[in-house]
Every structure is written in C-alpha cells, then in structure tokens.
Amino acid sequence: MITNERVRRPISDQELERRWAEVRKILAEKETDMIFLQGSNMHLGGYVRWFTDIPAEYNYNMTVLFPADDEMTLGRSSASPVPAWALRGVREIKYAPFCPTLNYSAESEVGLVVDFIRSRGAKRVGYAGKAFIHSAMMLSLLHTFPDVEFVDLSNEIDAVKALKSDEEMECARATARLHDAVWEALPAIVRPGMKEYQIRAELVRLATNMGSEEQLVFLGTAPQNTSCGMPTFQYQNRTVQEGDYGVLLLEVSGPGGYYCESSRNFSFGEPCKKLADAYQVCIEAQALTASMLTPGRPSIEIVAAYNKFVAERGYCQEGRLFGHSQGYDLVERPAFMCEDSRGNEDMVIREGMCCSLHPYLTDDFQTTYINDNFYVTKNGAERIHTIPYEMIIL
C-alpha cells in the first residue's frame, strides 16, 4: 500500500489485485486481448480510479489500457504527471500534450491508444463505459483497425464494480460518518441574511477540512408555502430570510474517493402544513423502498412501488432517477429508473451493493427531499448514516 503522506486514503494493494484478477477472468471468458476505458473527472470517472487508485481530474481525459497478460499502460495529458511512487500495476505512462478544448490536440491523445493496440497486435479489444469514450477516440480506432473486433464489456465490469468488498465498505462508511458530522454542524452554519452560495461555501470548507475529496452541494431556500426547488451553484444567489425553509443535498466523497449522498429539509421555525405533510410522505416512501432492497429484486420494481405510493397520496411521481448504487462514481449501476422503451436497467439488486434512495416531492407549495445510503445484506438493507430522519428546525 502507498504510505506517502500526500495521499489521504490509498486503497490497499490486495484490493487492487482482487479487482485486476476479476477483470482478467472477464477477459479470459470473453476471449479478449485487452480492455481500455477513459475518465475525465472524479464524480463520474470511477472506472479509472477503480483500476488504478489514481483519479482522473479537471476534465482532462485519462485512458487505462489493461492487457490480459501484462501490467497496465496509462495515457494522460503531459500537464498532469503522476509520481512514480503512486503507480501500482502500471508498466508505463504515455504522455501527450492534449486538452479537450483544443480540438486539434485530440489526435495526440488518440495516437497513444493506437500505438498501444498496434504494438500488442490485439485482435479483440474490450472497452467499458461507452458514454465516457469520446468520439475522436472511437472514430479513429474503428477507422485505423477495421480488422479488430471491439467488444463492449461494460456490463461485465459494472457487475464486479457494483459489489463492494469489506475494504470498500470501510471507505463508504467513513464517508457516511463525514456526512453525519456536516449535518450535525448545519444549525451552527445556516442563518438568515446569508446568501445560499455562502452557506454552500461553509459546508464545502467543513467537508474539505474533514478529508473530503470532492463536494457537490445543492441548496435551495424559499418562503413557506412556495417551492424552493433544488438549485445548482449557478442559482444559489438568494438571500435567506427569517421563516424560510430549504432543501440541502450533499453529494460528497470522503477520504479515498468513495461517494455517499444525504439530504434533508430544514426550516426556520415550524414548517407549514403542506411542507410537513410532504416530508412525512418522503420518510415513509424511503422506508418502503429500503425494505425492498433485497438480493435478486429488479430495481424497476422498487421505482414502480415508489411511484404508486406517492401517486396514491397526491404527489408527483419519479420520472428520472429515484436511486442508484454508489462507489467511486456518484451514480453507479444499478440505477433505479422507470421503464423506458429505449433501454432499461437489467442489473438486479445483489448482496454487497451500497445504494442511495432519494424520494423527491415538489409542487407549487413545497419541495421535500430525503436521501440516505443503504448497504444490501442477505437479509435486507442497512442504513449507513446516523442522521435523524426528522426535518431540521432552526
């Protein structure tokens, strides 16, 4: 394991070797010479870190080239060299001067991958995460190697990545404890007269000082009996007033890069009836769906049960993303989404997953949101946060 003090929480050598062994099993089963994948950021770039324990950052692409019979080769921008002591299972890093905003530099990045595939004489090449591999890369590879078969191995890699080892769950639980501490501090931070972005800045500072690696914070406030929504940073300029209520969503990773999510409503004084009623439905809806987090269940069944529950009580149904697994990625498979003619999640719930469930109810009079992480055991789900369910009264 890395012992350099510059890394907050390195993953162990044993854990990396476990992952590599699983990948090599997949390559052997699929008769594939190698697999490649890309990432460009931390909150949705988990493939790269899962293979290497090195995050992709700042929207600069990082490419992992993983052969079936050798150590990895990495492709990175020459603007961000990796120290030698941080490399494990890596034979070499190939650097090139590229940046996604410099359209003409894409060929420099692509050339690293072309040269590697050609040098290996690969005939069957796997890839994972097609939504992360940019068009210049795939177009060039398909044109340059017309006789090479490119195989999507995303499902196979995702199935392994979704099941958390004991060490990975240690990281996830540490992140949950960090969230718990931020929520405990919230009443001392939020006060009337502050801009929403100032509250956000204090929360980010606190999480960072406790070891968090990346912080996405959604925050909205409004007068009672109106909707506050859940604004992103661009729309967090409102000044908080006495008597307001709000929604706070923390999408914050801990030391080691594992994500959790947590959300609660808060209110200056007692909430109005419409807000209090909707919040209670959120609590009940999450309890219902958490009870359904059992091995073998399709996630689409959980979404259907949730939508039926809230619709019967007169609230909006979820048409986007009700829940999902988490790890190095903020959103991992399986996703909890409604049936869609263009494609559905086919990964079932399994023991060892760490899932986020987030009932969200909004109308003209209120916005309520509850979010917690649950670890799936053979006997059902275990909530890993200790935040009280009650709305926070300030």
Predicted regions, residues:
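Active-site neighborhoods and metal-handling regions in enzymes and metal-associated proteins
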Residues: M1-L394
